[in-house]
């Protein structure tokens, strides 16, 4: 009886698809047969060549990048290729095609519409969420900002804290109109956060940014759900848009009671 149970367990384990074992939310698992056809279906593809069952900080960073990319654009495929140097040597020929160093995994490539046009992430660059975003931004017209951030808002809010009050009010009015045009609920929520911070900085001055950052960090460090942590992180990312190297504008005087 015990022998039968062990046999059934082994069969079940070997029947589990490898895509279940490799946890990378939003990633497509490619192999030698599907690689070229899949990459050619997208304007751009970021592909990570790695060991068959990756783990650790670099894999976690790539997974986080995948989540951010899916929120930001439909024109970018995020994929993985598991390379085995044992058994049937799965995908080893594909790794050899791109001169992947199996002693220095992972190797990350950005493909531009076909399997022969690509750029490799330099081996000296750390595999982090921010570096992967920068890699895509530097080599494509795509924008993958920090979670919560809106490209159009970021572009017009540079040095917002230092511009005259009248210009701040004009920007508030302008972005209020843009916020009303947004159809995605999450984007609408993020836009509301921008507008709240714009009004607060206009009313209180730059000190608000420092005080609000500390408050949100305290909340994030407390006992909150993962969903709440993600919400707080989005707000912190939006707040960073307003940060300036030097404050040149005098804060509004507080009214005496």
UniProtKB/Swiss-Prot annotation:
Segments carrying the region annotation (CXXC motif) are 24-27
Compartments in which it is found = Endoplasmic reticulum lumen
Q: What is the effect of changing residue 86 to S/F?
A: Does not affect subcellular targeting of pip
**Changing residue 212 to Q: reported impact?**
Affects subcellular targeting of pip
Entry keywords, A to Z: Chaperone, Developmental protein, Endoplasmic reticulum, Signal
Q: What is the effect of changing residue 84 to D/Y?
A: Affects subcellular targeting of pip
Listed result of changing residue 41 to S? Does not affect homodimerization. Abolishes homodimerization and subcellular targeting of pip
Other remarks in the entry: 'Windbeutel' means 'profiteroles' in German.
Q: What does this protein do?
A: Probable chaperone protein involved in dorsoventral axis patterning in early embryos. Probably acts by folding and targeting pipe (pip) into the Golgi.
Q: Kindly provide the name given to this protein in its UniProt entry.
A: Protein windbeutel
